C-alpha cells in the first residue's frame, strides 16, 4: 500500500483516488491464506477461472472519472486500496465504518486480509495479512438456501446503496464532469486514433466477452431490487453491515494514521463511487425483460469463469486488445474501455419493454400526425364553410319561419276540422232527434190503431159507447162554448204556427241553399286547388327556369354593373378631361375671339385703307365696277352672317326643344317605373284580398256552425212550446174521445201524412248521406287545400322573392335611368357646347374665307396693278430707248455738223458711251428684274393654288362634319322615335293595367254579388228548416185537427214551391259556376298578361342597356369628333397665322405699290414739265438723265419685284 504512489508516477500525475481491484483465482485452488500472482491470461483460461474488476477513481485536475478493467493485466491480487496525495497508507482514509464500502476480502474473525500480490499499476509490496475464505459459488448466490454470514461475500451493487449513510451528501457535479470528459474523448476519437486501430476495431465473439456485473453502473434498478430481495431472503442486512464494518476495521488499524487532507480526499472519492453506484437506480426498466445474472463476489476458492456474453468479459477483451502493443498509460486505456462500453451498452441493453415503448411512441406519433391532419382538414373545411355558414343560417332562419307559418296553418286547419266535426256531430244529433220523433210518431200511430181496433170491437161495447156518447152530448153542449174559445185560441196558435212554418220554410230553404252553395264552393275550391296545384307545378317549373334566367340575368347585370362602373369611372375621367379640354378650348376661344376682334379691327383698318385706296383709285383710274363688286360682296357677307345667325338661333331652339323632349321622356320613364311599382303593389293587394276572401269563407263557415247551434237551441225551445201545446190538445182529445168518426178520418189523414213524413225522412236521409259524402269530400279537399296552400305559400314566397328581385332590378333600372338622364343631360350640354363651338368655328371659317377671298381679290388687283405698272415701265423704257436713239441720231448729226467741235465733244462722247453702257446694263438688270417678277408671280400663283386647295380641303372637312352632324341628327331622330315607341308601349302598359284594375273591380263586384247570393241562400235555407220544423210539429199535432186535407195540400204546394226553388237555385249555382270559371280564366289571363308585361319589362331593360351602350358609343364618337374639331381648330389657327404673315407681306407690298405710284406720279409730272420746257442743251439732258436718277429708278423696280 505504501508503494502505490511510486508506481503511479510513470502513468501521469494523480491527485487522489480510490482503486478497487478484484482478480481471478485458478480453478485448482490454493490455500485460503495465499494468493498467487500470475501473468495475463487469455480469454479461454478466463472462462474456467475466477475473474475480477478493477475500478479506478482518479482525479485529473480535480475532475474525477471511472475506469473499469477486468484485472487481467496485473497479478491475481485482491483488496481495496485507497490512494491519496501523500505517501502514507490508506488506513487514515477510513474514518468511520459506515462511510466505506465493504471489503469482500476481509476475514470473518477480524484479522486483516493480506494481498500477496497486486496489479501492475499497484504497489507490489502491499500485501494482505489474512486469507480469503471460500464461500458458495456464483450459482448458489441466487439460491434460496441459507448462508452463514461468516462465509459469504457481497457484491458491489449490493453494497453501494447500503454504504451511503443518510447523513452523507451526494455531490452530482462529478457526473457532469464525467459526461464532459466522455464528450472530450468522443471528439478526440473522432479526430485522432490512439493506439493500434487494427486491434481496437477487432471484435471478439460473444463467448469471450466477460464483464463484472458487480460494477455495472448501467444496470436497471429493478434487477438490483430483485437481488436485494434475494439477499434479504438469505440473511439479515444488519449482520451483513456488521460483518462489513468488522472487515473494514481490522485493516484500518494496521497502518499509521494519515492527515486530514488524505481522509477528506478519500471520503470524497468514496462518496463519488457510491453516487456512481446509486445513479443507475433512476434508470429502471422492465424487470421481466432485463434478467441479468447477479454479480459474482470474489469469494474464497471461487473458480468459475464469467459468462462469455457478460460485460466483464467484454471489458477484459477490450482492455487486452487496447493494452497489447500500446505505450499509453493504464488510466487512458481504462478510459477508452469505459467509453467503448458506454457506447456499446445502449446496443446491448435494449429490452422488449423499450421496443414496445418505441412502438407505442411510433403509434402515438402516427396518431398525432393523423389528428393534426384531421385538424388541418377541419380547419380548412371550416374556412371553406364559413362563407356558406351565413347563407345556411339565413336558410335555417327562413325555414324556421316557414315551419312556424306552416304550424300556424296546421293549427288553423285543425281548428277548422274540429269545427267541421262539431257541425257533423250537431247534424248527427239532429238526425237522431228526427229518428226519435219518427219512432214517437210510429208509436202514436200504433196506439191509434189499437184504439181503433178497440172501437171496432163487439156490439155491447158499441152500446156502451153510444150511452157514453149521449151522456157526452150534454156535456158537449156545455163544452161547445169552451170549444169555441179553444178554437179561437187554436186559430191564433195556427196563425202563429203558419208564421213559424213560413219562417221555418225560409230557414230550411236558406239552409239547403247554403249547404248546396257550400258544396258547390267546395267543389269549386277543389277544382281551383287542383288547377292551382297544376298551375303551381307549372309555375314552379317556370319559376325554376326563371330563377336560372334571373340568376343568369343577375350575373349578367353584375358583370354589366362592373363594366358600367368601370366604364363610368373611365367616362368620368374622360368627362373630366373633356371638361378640362373644354375649359381650355373656351379659353382658347376667348383668345380667338380677342384675336378675332383684333383681326376685325385690323381688317377694318385695312378696309378703311383699301377704301381710301379705292377712292384714290377712283380718283386716278375711275374704276366704279370694282367698288360695286366690293359692295355686292359686303352685302352677301352681311346676308350670310344674318343667315348664319338665324341658323344658329334655330339650332339653339331645336336643341332646347330636344332637351325638353328628353326631359319629358325621362319623366315618362319615371312615371312608367312608378306605374310598374303601382302594378306590383296592386298585385300584392290582390293577393291580400284573396287571402281575406279565404279568411272570410272560413269565418262564414264558423258563423254557419254557430248559427246552426243557435237555430238548434231555438228549435228546441219551439219544440218544447209545441209539445206543451200538444199536451193541451191531447187533453182536449181525451175530452173529445167520443168523436171517433172524426178521429178515423184524422187517422187516415195522419197515415197519409206519415207516408209523406216517411218520404221526407227518406229524403232527409239521402240528404244526410249526401252531406256526409260532401263532408268527406270537403275533408279531402281541405287536406288537399292544406297541401296546396303549403305549395302556394312556397310559390308565394318565391314570387315575393321574385317581386323583391324585380323591385331591386327596377330600382337599379331607375338608378341607371337617372345616370343615363344625367349622362344625356351632360351629352346635351356638351353637344350644345360643341354646336356653339362649331358655329363659332364656322363663323370664323366663313370670316376667314371672306378675308381670304378679299385678300385674293386684293392680290389679283395688286397683280393687275403690277402688270399695269410693268407695262408702263416697259413703255417708259421703250420711250427712253427711242429718245436715246433720237438723241444719238441728233448727236451724230451734231457730230457731223460739228466735226470741228469733235475734240471738244470727245469727252462728252466718252461720257455718252459710258452712259449707253450704263443704260445697256440697266436694261439687262430690268430684264433680270422682269424675270424675277415673273418668277414671283408664278410663286404667288402656286401659293394661291395651295390656298385654293386648302380651302377645298376645308370645304370637304366641313362637308364631312355636316355629314357627321346629319348622322348624329338621324341618330337623335331614331332615338326620339324609339322613345316615342317606348311611350306608346308605356301607354299600352298603362291601358293594360287600367283594364286589369277594371277587371279586378268587376271581380270584386261579382264576389260581392256572390256573397249577397250566398246570404240569400242561407236565409232560404233557414226558412226551409223552419218549414220542416213546422211540418214536423204539424205531424205531431195532426191528431187533434179535423181538416188535414188542407194541410196536406198546403204541404204539397209548399213542397212544389221548394222543389222549384231548389231547381232555380241549382240553375243559379250553374250560372255562378260558369261565372266563377270565367273569372278564373280572366285571372289566368291577367297572370299571363302580367308575365308578358314582366317579359316586356325585361326586354325593355335589355333594350335600355343596349341603348346605354349605344349612347356610350355615341359619346365615344362625339369625343372623336371633338378631337377632330380640335385638330381642325389648330389647323385653322396655323392657317390664320400664315394668313397674318401673308397679310403682313401684302401690307408691305401695298406700301411699296403706294410708293411706286407716288414716284410714277412724280415722274409723270416731271416728264410733262420737261416736254413743255423742251430741253435742248446737253447739260439739261445730263441733269435729267444723270446716272443717279437712272439707278434710283432701277432700284425702285428691284424693290417692286422683291416685294412681290
UniProtKB/Swiss-Prot annotation:
Q: Which residues carry this modification: Phosphoserine?
A: 95-96, 98, 135, 137, 140, 155, 165, 214, 217, 258, 276, 338, 351, 1176-1177, 1183
The GO cellular component terms are: bicellular tight junction; myosin complex
InterPro entries according to UniProt: Myosin_tail (IPR002928)
Residue segments, region Interaction with TJP1/ZO1: 54-67
| Ranges of compositional bias, category Polar residues | 93-119, 232-245
Lineage, top-rank taxon, reads: Eukaryota
Q: Where is this region: Disordered?
A: 25-48, 68-174, 186-266, 379-398, 1161-1182
One biological process term in Gene Ontology: microtubule cytoskeleton organization
Ranges where the record places region Head = 7-357
Q: Where are residues bearing N6-acetyllysine located in the sequence? A: 579
One GO molecular function term?
A: microtubule binding
Low complexity: compositionally biased ranges: 247-261
Where is this chain primarily localised?
other
Asked if the record carries the keyword Ion transport, the reply is: no
Give the protein's recorded name: Cingulin
Please give the organism.
Answer: Plecturocebus moloch
Q: Which gene encodes it?
A: CGN
